[in-house]
Amino acid sequence: MPRATKMRVVTVDENGKELGDAKWVDIPEPDHFASDGFAQIESYVSRLLGSSARFTSIIIATPDQQMAVSLWQRAGVPEFTLSVEWRSEAERERAVRQFFSERGLSTSHDYLAGNGGVPDATRCLGYFLPPDVQFITALTKDVLRQIYHLREQDALDFSFKEHHDAV
């Protein structure tokens, strides 16, 4: 599967309703780590929390793009976001909800979005996080291990972006 080079970005409210106009943005080539991807997470989380941009994001993905999670910070509030194909990944959705509930983290968003021409194919979930590098690093590693069954030594791609003009 070829790597996507553009992404349509739109701001949505907590119910998934679009706010404002969407725009197409370039997706930069990710930083690729062929092994020990987990060892890179803390430095990216530090960059995220240290950013003064209005909106900053990190996408952490496997090189084959079969798994991806995102960390965001908007107006100083960090979030962990992910999506699941809820019809075919019901067990994963349940595991994600349980994982964050057990840690007392509240939902920032939970809505269905379109994918592949199916209007409600993808469940988009987000959770508010405390602005703590160690906590977010450990949580991210736990999600990758427990939900996605990745290992410390696995390859990971990181896309870091500061959006100074974000709303």
Task: Write out the residue ranges for each language-model feature.
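Structured alpha/beta or helical-core interaction and ligand-binding surfaces enriched in interleaved
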Residues: 2-167
